[in-house]
Amino acid sequence: MAIMHKIGCAGSEVETDRVLEKDQANNGHFVDSDCCFQETGSTGTANSICTLNDSEDDNSSLNSVDNNECTNLDCGGKKHKNLSPNPSFHVNINAAEFIPKSHNGYAPKSMNPPPEQLDSPCYPHFDQDSSSVIYPSPPSTYYPNMYVSANTFIPMPYAHYTDNMYHAKPVNRPNFLPREGTPPPFAQQPAEQFSPFNSEYESLLDFRALILGNLPVDYKISELLSLIHSGPLEKIQSNPGKRRIIITFLDSADAFFFYERYHPRGFIFHGRPLKLTFARPSPLPESIQNFCSNTAASRNVFIGNLPSSYHEKEIEEAFGKFGKIEHIKILSKKNIAFVHFLNIRDAIKVVRTLSCDPDYHSWRIFFGSDRCANHPPSFDERSCFTSKQNPDTTSDRCRQQESKDNGNRTVFLGNLHTKTKGHEICDLIRHGGLQDFHYIPEKHICFVTFITYSAANAFHDYLAEEEVLLHGRRIKVGWGKESGPLPRVLEDSILMGASRNVYFSHISDSLTTEELELILRQYGEIESIKYLKNRSSGFVAYTNISNAMKAVNGLPIHPLFKKSKIRYAPDRCEQELQKSKSNSPIQQNVPLQQFITPPFSYPVAYCPAIPPGSDPILNFGIQYQPFIPFTAVPSFPFNCNVPNYPQTSDHEND
């Protein structure tokens, strides 16, 4: 195999023509039978025979025959410098690169180059923080038999090196180039990309459950939960045979807050400290999350218009079939009650079922606030919990504390009169469509949730700046609980024209208003109904858009509404009030001149000339009418041709 090489040296260029042949008689050595060094500018030509040991011996190296004295007669016996490289390197002709050699074929344990090579630019310099080394192009004086070109356009060979094969900690390194059939050492293998947050159970958002251990034998869950005021709960799990209980919060930030508050000093219950540990993490179900976002669901069910005959036993019989009840509180003077369940799913079932039940149509059944969410007064002085690894774990309560009106769509109305009706409150709202309208007449308060943030801010500013009275009382305004962004399902439905107002037509004439209300109330709480019996049509406004969506999908299936047309109608809360017509010419943009112009034409004799320099055109675009003195006005302006009667009275001389 013939190979042409050009090796650049300092001050000279050497051209080498080599023919490497396999000499079977030379014990498997490669013999360079024609190794002719022609040095330009020298007195002669140096010829030498070089051999490359190709054996499997670990001590194989480059050897040269007669390294000190040239055997070529034309050279005149000129002595040359020793051209032997460091014996710890060998040449890979096929790969055209050289790799440090050791006992196992990979990285050497130690390298001791000769002193003259330490200062050489071709000697490889290793960095402690790097796992690879770049070999620059060596001069021919050090590596005469290296098949390396000095041409800068040819890429330089790379050799990977590590100073310690067994690191205490795996690190990422470039791919090692081992010999065939030998795996790379452990230090050269790429480290696995592992993150503690890759698993769904490693996210901080899922750590919502806490185990309370070391409970007394005779304890009540209601007594224990009355001491917890860190945030609303999703469920409470207890086992009668074990003296422990598992409480699951809706928000992981509340769970961390409760743990950090009571873990150092202990949670004291019945004179004994309880053990606090985190349970297995579990994500919040999507169905419960949507219900909490849309309807502010909780474990607490609020009951309004409660009959006086209902006591705790009757309520437990009526609501106990949906799930286990944790606590019941009845306010007989206000005819209201609060029922706390052990699981939020049971409370959702109650609201969805009984709010549409005709037997309970006179009751007001909705969600109340969880009594575990009542924070102590010192909460404002504490800092809110935020995870450094996951900033999204900041609770909604903390965000509301930082900025009350930052992206909030819920407006609070207070100081309402007892005679105030729900439709009267909606008649005051003309700033945008509503997502939810929750009026609590027993507490004289109301919560209005708009579709957009801008509409909520406009309505809040309107009530804050203007003195709005309703039944003689000024309405107090504030911000309610942060509503968060609009759910994607409602957002898409609103873009398609959905609203809380539903139009129906072509219904049976035999239906009365009471019967129609019972049918429409099956899909949710109603704010107002407008029934046009003569036209067999009407409008129903629900308190929530979700209820209106149920009615639009469910009414066409009803037997009495098969022939009727059901569709959404615009929400009246997003329609601006029509301004009353005014007789003021300024508000009607009517020129004032037509009102001050007399209803008759002046005689020519009574029309004074327009003074010079005056503008005959006013801003109104009507010809200027000069001012006429009182004496020049005729006595009878009904006709301009009437004679001029004397202006004196017949009784002046009497």
Swiss-Prot record:
GO molecular function, one term: RNA binding
Signal peptide (from-to): none
Keywords, in A-Z order: Cytoplasm, Meiosis, Repeat, RNA-binding
Subcellular location: Cytoplasm
GO cellular component: cytosol
Annotated transmembrane regions: none
Compositional bias per record (Basic and acidic residues), positions renumbered to this chain: 394-404
Domain RRM residue range list: 299-355, 409-482, 500-571
Biased composition range(s): Polar residues: 384-393
Region (Disordered): 383-404
PANTHER family attached to this UniProt entry: PRE-MRNA-SPLICING FACTOR RBM22 (PTHR14089), RNA-BINDING PROTEIN MRN1 (PTHR14089:SF8)
Function of the protein: Has a role in meiosis.
Name used for this protein in its record: Meiotically up-regulated gene 24 protein
Organism: Schizosaccharomyces pombe (strain 972 / ATCC 24843) (Fission yeast)
Gene: mug24
